[in-house]
Amino acid sequence: MKPMTSSALRGFCRDRRGASAIEFALLAPLMLGLYIGCVEISEGIAADRKVTLTAGALANLSAQATTISIADMQNILAASTAIMSPYTGTTAAKVSCLKINADSVAKVTWGVASTGVTPRAEGDVVTIPVNLAVPNSSLIFSEVSYQYIPVTGFIPSFSRISNTGITLSDVMYMSPRITPPVYDTKACS
């Protein structure tokens, strides 16, 4: 191999033919990372919004009824799957009726949950916001949680989040529309 002459070295430094390829090689990983990050953030926000909509729908559908049969409640809980679409993971949903006593303590009078989820037990005390603790009243209380697993599970730096996912959850309180609903002979009063 011949030693490089000073004129050859100057010519090499002035040559700009590969500059675009080098710039692309440096910027492409950054641009790809930004794109994947934007997609993941928007997907996560959309999934969280679906969780909030599901909690609201469960409480709203339960608060509208005066009596709720077991079949009606199964349909209400099944609606959570439809609302969460296109997210196909397991949605854990609970609906409870809370009776608030004269001391503003909210206790569960009946509770149901989606398949594989333990409902709140009758008599459980539930902490509710102070402005909702109206003595001698009732509330419908829904809880929804969803395990969101990011699409970028194949990227090693995200493996800690990607393997376990992120738990998205929300709760909703609604006042019964007409009277506190009776669920399968269990009154909410």
Please report, for each region that a protein language model flagged, where it lies by residue.
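Short, conserved structural patches
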Residues: 56, 60-189
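Alpha-helical assembly-interface signal, strongest on the long, hydrophobic N-terminal helix that forms
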Residues: 1-83
